[in-house]
Amino acid sequence: MVANLKGSRINILDLTKAFGHKTVLNSLNLEVAPGEFIAIVGRSGCGKSTLLRLVSGLDKPTTGGILLDGEPLRKLSHSVRVMFQEPRLLPWKRVIDNVGLGLQENWQSKATWVLEQVGLKDRAGEWPHVLSGGQRQRVALARALVSQPHLLLLDEPLGALDALTRLEMQYLIEDLWRERGFTAFLVTHDVEEAVALADRVIVIEEGRIMLDLPVRLPRPRDRASELFINIREAVLEQVMNNESNNKNQLLQMSH
């Protein structure tokens, strides 16, 4: 039903966001190519979720701006979808109705198809409360993808899942991203998750980009490889603000 959707290009231009006297993001500049998978990591309160809200159009910058496919972003676009840590399913609607929410023509066939993509076609007629946490997040992923977005924003969507389910969801998200070609923008606390999924890992500290690291490893990523482990540990050191971290060495690792 879908063949290689074009991902959106994002240009973040001198972006600042302040709440009162507190500056959360400070003169941020970032370019994301169409179809690229970006992971944003950093300590709690560093501004990564605020950045995602700004890119989604759910919030507005104090100064600076964001271009989505060359056009100023002023509100949530129909080509952008957000997936949160909580599935946010409507308990009074069945699974297929949650997925098809807001769709019009042929919505049932579209919803059924995307449920098949996430492995839940046989649960379409069930209520959300009978599903496991991982299954509910699969429904949330299906709901985000059913409208065929060009940009998928992922706000720590796997943070509440157990380790095995989280790993399964990571593989699922990666497979669907590779198949569809949308741009993916992931906010996560999990450095291993970031290195496993992203084309680039970006570390934010005190509202600024402190590291923008390409991860040039073949997919699917071998998490036991020495290079993967070295990159993961080096990014973690940067997140933990270890002064001995050498950014030039990081860039050499990715080649």
UniProtKB/Swiss-Prot annotation:
InterPro entries: AAA+_ATPase, ABC_transporter-like_ATP-bd, ABC_transporter-like_CS, ABC_transporter_ATP-bind, P-loop_NTPase. The keyword Translocase applies. It catalyses: ATP + H2O + aliphatic sulfonate-[sulfonate-binding protein]Side 1 = ADP + phosphate + aliphatic sulfonateSide 2 + [sulfonate-binding protein]Side 1. It is found in: Cell inner membrane. Residues 10-231 form the ABC transporter domain. It comes from the Bacteria. Part of the ABC transporter complex SsuABC involved in aliphatic sulfonates import. Responsible for energy coupling to the transport system. Belongs to the ABC transporter superfamily. Aliphatic sulfonates importer (TC 3.A.1.17.2) family. This is Aliphatic sulfonates import ATP-binding protein SsuB.
